[in-house]
């Protein structure tokens, strides 16, 4: 009965876990299977704070007033939906709350009702997945009075199902579009503005969505009921005709205005009688465009649309036909031009229209033979009735044709497996004057209420009694007696009396009404009926309704005069014949079916259809009669709560069972949950279905009070228990899938590891070939003309190029690039740190650190300077590579070279770079092999513009490592022969083979499964760690570390010679230091806590001190109960921890040469107090550092890593660890100052002056 059961396919795994959360949330704390309470915290954290109760079955007091108060509280907080079990109660908010967006819709997809707040989407989700999982037809019955929101609920259900039903095929999507397009189309022709609702459905609609076996929509069918055709010809003040008339007259295109003479709605009687032309917040022109679009989606051709609008125009012009009395009192038409236009629209003869409106043809018959024919003139009242009858007949038949046309387009395009029906029919109506239309509407609502009673109340109790289930019976009101009062033939009901009156006195309307009143006297004995003068009262489930007798018989006849049928039969328009297909049988004397006969048959057919499906219910409530948002009329809502029977529904829900299923289907659904009924997914139980169901419930640990076993069914009390079973079933398949996934992932991991090993081997074999080729090009470029450095010939040496990372995004290299202004379009070929010879006024030239960068366009010499103690990076010199005339270098192993430009404004740079050969190679490639590399025993360059200078290069064996520049001479040590080439690449270190995978499903060692070397290697024995020398430390307030004896420490560091004949036994290890004790305090006085965060203590107790505060309170813990709280400091006396005993002395060692024991032995250490910690070292004096002798120069930094530097001295080429660090400038300042100190020890030369 609308249960949110889990589908067999398990589309959403999260649904099962959600049920676990529900069990933990609502259950009584017992373990109901597996791990249902694991997700409790997650579930609570995702739910927003609940207003009132979301399910009325959770009310502590069950009464109509309590239900009303809860609905009012939730309504005031914009929570319009509330559950009664699986029945949804909806309160119309009369405004958009933003709760029907796609995001909200997706949040309900695949969720049971307890995982998410109450919503109409949850009802749609339950119906759809129950249909898909259990192959049961579903229906959603939406009930409530007019204006309560039934139509909106039906549209939202269609919106949800269209969204989640899947199917990417174009035909399926087209079916969805057509189903959704039926809403604006049928609303425009079937809805109207009433006093209580701006978009009131004036017809009943049962939409049946048809699905294939995959749950994809393949078609639909619409059945319409009770179109209020009387609204076409008249409305009360402030109401409107059907929407389509105002849409058409306001927004009709010029084509229709020319063809059909369409004017504004004020020009027509049928649209202006009520003096209401507009609806607040509704744009009729925009609605008309939606209607035309819906017609196109449905597949109506342009010709069909033209005929529909022709009929609408004909109805409007028929209403403008007016009559007057002639001298004889007969009706005559006042404006013949209107009749002529009506005849043009209907394509009939105008004279025939005149005759049909003003004359009635009567025929007498005698003895079964045709008699005389008479033409009886009509008076004005009769003529108006004939005119209106024609207009109503055209519109009624036109509406039926539209529904049939929609059904033809929605015909199933595949095999239909199941269906979901949505019933949207206007609700119970009570007006000041109620007539035949209200009687029919209220009769249908009585039938729907009877279904609800039968399926939710009576059927519930009957099934419990039939299955011998113990439960508490609930009294309820069965409205079957009211339905019998209206529809029964024996004894005759209201409809039977009405039909009898119409048949007896069919000629005179007033006589027929009087006859009807007489027939109603026979119903006076019925307790639900009262007959009064000119009216009668029926006691409906929604309240007592008084119906006026006047005019009921005429409305019940529902017959179109044969004269009008003959008129439309002469039409030359084929569409008119389609609307009126029946032929007039002049000899048929049988009484045609009346309106009450038709509505009775339709209602019974509807009931039969609904009884074949599993229903879900939405009970809509109208909070006020003013259509005002945020207004809640307590009295009106309380009345609706009573007649909807919500209190009885809550009571029976609380007393009954949420789920029931036959034994065989229950076992079929859940046999996987018991190891005794299944193995590897196969059903293995050999007993009957009942015993199998019991075994499943036993193995899933369902408490006995949560279910009962009936005669043929198992009954589960709460939905949470069912959710737990479904969650376990989902986890079963989930676990099976995990096993398959684990094996597949293990194989993929194995395959990936194999590929990685092959790639690693290939990269190891061929990796770096490009850089090795560049290195070989460097050998060719030097061509045996220059001695080589030993490090340059290493086999692992590669020409990597951009050592500083100037071409990288992010990091220090990007800072250098941005500071130097290197364009992003330039490709970085080479970057490295080096030195440039800098000339200063009055001083000798000195090397200064710089960054050398080479791109495909320029050579950049980049400087790093301190400005206002901030590091500033800038390009000191930018040289286009095309302007380089030559590069000069010596034939020794030094790293100096000149870049000869010959600029008239700037000197040529003389550069010192450890990767000079790599620079030459990249520059030669950038110049496409046109580099002029001059190698000699000296280096030439323009020291000043136009002034050629020569730098001598001298081989000095005294230079151990790096070359040095002084007074125009470079001193360098001997190098490798000039014809030397790089050594072969060294072989990598051999490592043991690793298993391809460590998984349990595949054997280690590779595809063959052989043992790996790693697995065969024995595990090394654990070696004891040497004891560290004790370091002075701060004394701890709780406990002190036990000092080791000096002899033991000395013995642990004594190295025994290999020639010793006897090894003394090692001393025993010292005793382990006891764990530090927590500080404790003794309670001096009793203290009783006054607040929840305070701790009560008694004098003499020992408590543990957790923390101390400076405000006179200590946080303490009772060592017996572990309770914590705040206690006053004055009530406590802190206990001093005793000094631990020293370790026992070691046994005497054998007589051998061992160090003498120190004076501070173990006993002295035990007695000595711990020394206070040494004060922190003072900050070094920078002035004193200048007097320190210059340390030997450190190896030059090649800038391979940005993190290598020495701030204490050296060549000063180092840079800070990170250019993004805040101390970068300070570190660089230290480096620059260190270089200045180093240079002070060198003698200045006067080579510049």
From Swiss-Prot:
GO biological process: actin cortical patch localization; actin filament organization; endocytosis
Entry annotated with the keyword Repeat: yes
Protein's UniProt keywords contain Isomerase: no
Entry's localization field: Cytoplasm, Cytoskeleton, Actin patch
Pro residues bias spans: 1021-1035, 1064-1077, 1139-1150
SUPFAM superfamilies named in the record: P-loop containing nucleoside triphosphate hydrolases, SH3-domain
Biased composition (Polar residues): 1200-1221
Residue ranges annotated for the IQ domain, each copy included: 734-754, 755-780
Pfam family, one: Myosin_TH1
Domain Myosin motor: 51-730
Stretches for region Actin-binding: 419-501
Maturation and modification: Phosphorylation of the TEDS site (Ser-372) is required for the polarization of the actin cytoskeleton. Phosphorylation probably activates the myosin-I ATPase activity.
UniProt-listed SMART domains: MYSc, SH3
PROSITE patterns: MYOSIN_MOTOR, SH3, TH1
Annotated InterPro entries: Fungal_myosin-I_SH3, Kinesin_motor_dom_sf, Myo1_CA, Myosin_head_motor_dom-like, Myosin_TH1, MYSc_Myo1, P-loop_NTPase, SH3-like_dom_sf
GO CC annotations, alphabetized: actin cortical patch; actin cytoskeleton; cell tip; cytoplasm; myosin complex; plasma membrane
Domains as described in the record: The myosin motor domain displays actin-stimulated ATPase activity and generates a mechanochemical force. The tail domain participates in molecular interactions that specify the role of the motor domain. It is composed of several tail homology (TH) domains, namely a putative phospholipid-binding myosin tail domain (also named TH1), an Ala- and Pro-rich domain (TH2), followed by an SH3 domain and a C-terminal acidic domain (TH3).
Function: Type-I myosin implicated in the organization of the actin cytoskeleton. Required for proper actin cytoskeleton polarization. At the cell cortex, assembles in patch-like structures together with proteins from the actin-polymerizing machinery and promotes actin assembly. Functions as actin nucleation-promoting factor (NPF) for the Arp2/3 complex. Plays an important role in polarized growth, spore germination, hyphal morphogenesis, and septal wall formation.
Protein name according to UniProt: Myosin-1
Organism: Aspergillus fumigatus (strain ATCC MYA-4609 / CBS 101355 / FGSC A1100 / Af293)
């Amino acid at each position: 009965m609308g249960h949110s059961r889990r589908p067999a396919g398990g589309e959403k795994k999260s649904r099962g876990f959600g049920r676990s959360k529900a069990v933990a949330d609502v259950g009584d704390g017992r373990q109901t299977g597996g791990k249902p309470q694991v997700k409790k915290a997650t579930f609570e954290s995702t739910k927003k704070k609940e207003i009132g109760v979301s399910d009325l079955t959770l009310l502590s007091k069950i009464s109509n007033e309590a239900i009303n108060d809860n609905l009012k509280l939730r309504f005031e907080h914009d929570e319009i939906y509330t559950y009664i079990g699986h029945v949804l109660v909806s309160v119309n908010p009369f405004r958009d709350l933003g709760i029907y967006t796609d995001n909200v819709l997706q949040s309900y997809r695949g969720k049971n009702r307890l995982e998410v707040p109450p919503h109409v989407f949850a009802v749609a989700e339950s119906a759809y997945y129950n249909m898909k999982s259990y192959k049961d037809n579903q229906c959603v019955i939406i009930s409530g009075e007019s204006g309560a929101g039934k139509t909106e609920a039906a549209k939202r259900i269609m919106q949800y199902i269209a969204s989640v039903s899947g199917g990417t095929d174009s035909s399926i999507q087209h079916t969805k579009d057509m189903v959704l397009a039926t809403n604006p189309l049928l609303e425009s022709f079937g809805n109207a503005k009433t006093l209580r609702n701006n978009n009131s459905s004036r017809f009943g609609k049962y939409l049946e969505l048809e699905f294939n076996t995959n749950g994809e929509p393949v078609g639909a069918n619409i059945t319409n009921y009770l179109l209020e055709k009387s609204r076409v010809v008249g409305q009360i003040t402030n109401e409107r005709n059907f929407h389509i008339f105002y849409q058409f007259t306001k927004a009709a295109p010029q084509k229709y205005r020319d063809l059909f003479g369409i004017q504004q709605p004020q020009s027509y009687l049928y649209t202006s009688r009520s003096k209401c032309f507009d609806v607040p917040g509704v744009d009729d022109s925009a609605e008309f465009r939606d209607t035309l679009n819906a017609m196109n989606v449905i597949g109506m051709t342009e010709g069909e649309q033209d005929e529909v609008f022709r009929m609408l125009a004909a109805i409007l012009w028929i209403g403008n036909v007016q009559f007057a009395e002639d001298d004889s009192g007969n009706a005559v038409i006042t404006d013949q031009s209107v009749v002529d236009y009506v005849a043009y629209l209907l394509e009939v003869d105008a004279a025939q229209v005149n005759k049909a409106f003003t004359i009635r043809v009567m025929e007498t018959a005698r003895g079964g033979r045709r008699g005389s024919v008479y033409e009886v003139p009509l008076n004005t009242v009769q003529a108006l009735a004939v005119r209106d009858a024609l207009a109503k007949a055209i519109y009624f038949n036109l509406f039926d044709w539209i529904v049939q046309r929609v059904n033809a387009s929605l015909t199933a395009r595949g095999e239909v497996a199941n269906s979901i029906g949505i019933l949207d029919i206007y609700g119970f109506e009570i007006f000041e004057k109620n007539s035949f239309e209200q009687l029919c509407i209220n009769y249908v609502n009585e039938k729907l209420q009877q279904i609800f009673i039968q399926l939710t109340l009576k059927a519930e109790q009957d099934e419990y009694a039939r299955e011998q289930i113990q439960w508490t019976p609930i009294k309820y009101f069965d409205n079957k007696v009211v339905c019998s009062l209206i529809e029964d033939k024996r004894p005759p009901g209201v409809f039977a009396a009405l039909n009898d009156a119409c048949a007896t006195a069919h000629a005179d309307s007033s006589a027929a009404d009087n006859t009807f009143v007489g027939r109603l006297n026979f119903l006076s004995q019925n307790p639900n009926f009262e007959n009064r003068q000119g009216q009668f009262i029926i006691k409906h489930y929604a309240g007592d309704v008084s119906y006026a007798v006047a005019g009921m018989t005429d409305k019940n006849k529902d017959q179109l005069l044969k004269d009008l049928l003959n008129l439309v039969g002469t039409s030359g328009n084929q569409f008119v014949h389609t609307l009126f297909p029946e032929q007039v049988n002049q000899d048929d004397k049988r009484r045609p079916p009346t309106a009450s006969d038709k509505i009775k048959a339709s209602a019974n057919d509807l009931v039969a259809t609904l009884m074949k499906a599993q229903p879900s219910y939405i009970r809509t409530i109208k909070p006020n009669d003013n259509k005002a948002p945020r207004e809640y009329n307590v009295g009106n809502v309380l009345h609706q709560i009573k007649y909807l029977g919500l209190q009885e529904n809550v009571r029976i829900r609380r007393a009954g069972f949420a789920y029931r299923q036959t034994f065989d289907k229950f076992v079929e659904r859940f046999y996987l949950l018991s190891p005794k009924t299944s193995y590897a997914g196969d059903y293995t139980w050999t007993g009957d279905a009942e015993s199998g169901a019991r075994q499943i419930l036993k193995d899933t640990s369902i408490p006995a009070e949560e279910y009962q076993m009936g005669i043929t069914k198992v009954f589960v009390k709460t939905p949470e228990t069912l959710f737990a079973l479904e969650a376990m079933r989902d986890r079963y398949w989930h676990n099976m899938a995990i096993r398959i996934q684990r094996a597949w992932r293990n194989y993929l991991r194995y395959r990936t590891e194999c590929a990685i090993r092959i790639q690693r081997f290939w990269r190891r074999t061929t990796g770096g070939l490009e850089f090795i080729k560049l290195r070989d090009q460097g050998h060719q470029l030097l061509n045996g003309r220059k001695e080589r450095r030993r490090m340059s010939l290493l086999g692992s040496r590669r020409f990597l190029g951009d050592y500083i990372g100037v071409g990288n995004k992010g990091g220090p290299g990007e800072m250098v690039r941005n500071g130097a202004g290197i364009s992003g379009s330039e490709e970085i070929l080479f970057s490295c740190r080096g030195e440039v010879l800098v000339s200063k006024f009055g001083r000798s030239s000195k090397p200064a650190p710089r960054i050398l960068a080479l791109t495909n366009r320029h050579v950049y010499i980049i400087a790093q300077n301190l400005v206002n103690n901030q590091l500033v990076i800038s390009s000191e010199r930018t040289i286009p590579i095309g302007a380089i005339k030559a590069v000069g270098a010596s034939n020794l192993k030094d790293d100096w070279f000149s870049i000869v430009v010959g600029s008239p404004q700037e000197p040529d740079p003389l550069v010192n770079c450890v990767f000079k050969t790599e620079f030459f190679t990249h520059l030669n490639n950038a110049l496409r092999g046109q580099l002029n590399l001059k190698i000699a025993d000296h280096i030439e360059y323009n020291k000043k513009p136009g002034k050629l200078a020569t730098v001598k290069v001298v081989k000095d064996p005294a230079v151990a490592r790096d070359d040095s520049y002084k007074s125009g001479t470079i001193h360098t040590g001997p190098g490798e022969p000039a014809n030397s080439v790089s050594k072969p690449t060294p072989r990598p270190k051999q490592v043991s083979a690793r298993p391809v995978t460590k998984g349990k499903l595949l054997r280690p060692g590779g595809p063959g499964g052989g043992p790996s070397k790693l697995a065969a290697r024995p595990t090394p024995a654990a070696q004891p760690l040497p004891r560290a020398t004790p370091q002075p430390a701060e004394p701890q307030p709780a406990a002190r570390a036990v000092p080791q004896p000096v002899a033991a420490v000395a013995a642990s560091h004594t190295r025994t010679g290999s020639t010793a004949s006897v090894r003394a036994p090692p001393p025993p290890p010292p005793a382990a230091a006891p764990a530090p004790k927590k500080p404790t305090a003794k309670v001096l006085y009793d203290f009783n806590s006054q607040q929840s965060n305070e701790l009560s203590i008694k004098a003499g107790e020992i408590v543990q001190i957790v923390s101390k505060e400076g405000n006179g309170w200590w946080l303490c813990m009772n060592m017996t109960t572990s309770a914590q709280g705040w206690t006053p400091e004055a009530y406590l006396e802190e206990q001093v921890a005793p000094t631990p005993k020293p370790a026992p002395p070691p046994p005497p060692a054998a007589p051998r040469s061992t160090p003498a024991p120190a004076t501070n032995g173990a006993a002295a250490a035990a007695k000595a107090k711990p020394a206070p910690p040494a004060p922190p070292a003072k900050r070094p004096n920078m002035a004193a550092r200048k007097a320190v002798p210059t340390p030997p120069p450190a190896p030059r930094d090649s800038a391979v890593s940005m993190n290598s530097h020495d701030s204490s001295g050296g060549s000063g080429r180092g840079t800070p660890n990170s250019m993004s660090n805040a101390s970068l400038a300070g570190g660089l300042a230290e480096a620059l100052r260190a270089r200045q100190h180093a240079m002070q020890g060198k003698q200045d030369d006067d080579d510049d002056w």
